[in-house]
Amino acid sequence: MTRKQKRLSVIVGGLAFLGAATGLTFYALGQKASYFYMPADLTTASVQPGQRIRLGGLVEKGTIQRGQGATVAFSVTDTHKSVKVTYTGILPDLFREEQGVITEGSFGPDGVFVADSVLAKHDERYMPKEVADGLKAKGVWQESKSE
């Protein structure tokens, strides 16, 4: 092999390695992606059982039910549609009815959303961006004007 051929084979091998590394990186990132949905968006979305998503909205009034141990069942709503959610773990201190929440998890085979994390808004003037945008688009939520 001539010197030029060796150099060309090293360059081609390096480019092939970089291409494979880039492809594997994008594949891994695609597997970890978690898309955000409001309850009404789920009627048109094709979410498979077991697919990780983020579900956001307001905790529906009168739906919080404490189960055995640290298991809690509640519904997340955008006032157009509600989704039943179960969560096992310690809820944030600010978790309560009619407050903004983002849950992350997947749907079980029974159609109930099984959350493995729950995020609640941190004060009365803050709403998670995804939830606020979704509720504003549906005309449900308006920002309060601070004085």
UniProtKB/Swiss-Prot annotation:
* Topology term for the membrane: Single-pass type II membrane protein
Please give a single GO biological process term from the UniProt record.
cytochrome complex assembly
Q: Name one GO cellular component term.
A: plasma membrane
Q: Which residues lie on this side of the membrane: Cytoplasmic?
A: 1-7
The protein's UniProt keywords, in alphabetical order, are:
Cell inner membrane, Cell membrane, Cytochrome c-type biogenesis, Heme, Iron, Membrane, Metal-binding, Signal-anchor, Transmembrane, Transmembrane helix
Q: What is its main location?
A: membrane
Transmembrane regions: 8-28
Q: Which domain of life is it from?
A: Bacteria
SUPFAM superfamilies named among the record's database cross-references: Heme chaperone CcmE (SSF82093)
Quote the subcellular location field of this record: Cell inner membrane
Q: Name one GO molecular function term.
A: heme binding
Q: Reply yes or no: does the keyword NAD apply.
A: no
What InterPro entries does this protein's entry cite?
CcmE, CcmE-like_sf, NA-bd_OB-fold
User: Which positions does UniProt annotate for heme binding?
Assistant: 122, 126
Q: Which residues lie on this side of the membrane: Periplasmic?
A: 29-147
Described by its record, this protein's role is as follows: Heme chaperone required for the biogenesis of c-type cytochromes. Transiently binds heme delivered by CcmC and transfers the heme to apo-cytochromes in a process facilitated by CcmF and CcmH.
Recorded family membership: Belongs to the CcmE/CycJ family.
Q: What is this protein called?
A: Cytochrome c-type biogenesis protein CcmE
Originating organism: Mesorhizobium japonicum (strain LMG 29417 / CECT 9101 / MAFF 303099) (Mesorhizobium loti (strain MAFF 303099))
